[in-house]
Amino acid sequence: MSQTSFNKAQFQAALTRQWQHFGLQSASEMTQRQWWRAVSGALSELLSAQPVAKATEGERHVNYISMEFLIGRLTGNNLLNLGWYQQVSDELQAHDVNLTDLLEEEID
């Protein structure tokens, strides 16, 4: 599976749209919870803009969903798996926001 690319300019634009959606004049006005919501929304926007890989013809697969346990927080792991953790962290550092602290806002 190929690595999904991170676009810094698109992330910055998506982040700006998120804090403007809150009715704020600048990102510096956001609370920690608003930062969490803004980053989550921006990441969702970036991922939904990624092209969907086409399945190989004739290829079959099985999807299995288990409700046996709750797996907890996933954003940090997903950023690591995408190879985006450091880039997102760097972008947030420009706003004096620590990604590790921000990930604590995620609800279990």
From Swiss-Prot:
<keyword id="KW-0021">Allosteric enzyme</keyword>
<dbReference type="GO" id="GO:0004645">
    <property type="term" value="F:1,4-alpha-oligoglucan phosphorylase activity"/>
</dbReference>
<keyword id="KW-0328">Glycosyltransferase</keyword>
<keyword id="KW-0119">Carbohydrate metabolism</keyword>
<keyword id="KW-0663">Pyridoxal phosphate</keyword>
<comment type="function">
    <text>Phosphorylase is an important allosteric enzyme in carbohydrate metabolism. Enzymes from different sources differ in their regulatory mechanisms and in their natural substrates. However, all known phosphorylases share catalytic and structural properties.</text>
</comment>
<keyword id="KW-0808">Transferase</keyword>
<comment type="similarity">
    <text>Belongs to the glycogen phosphorylase family.</text>
</comment>
<protein>
    <recommendedName>
        <fullName>Maltodextrin phosphorylase</fullName>
        <ecNumber>2.4.1.1</ecNumber>
    </recommendedName>
</protein>
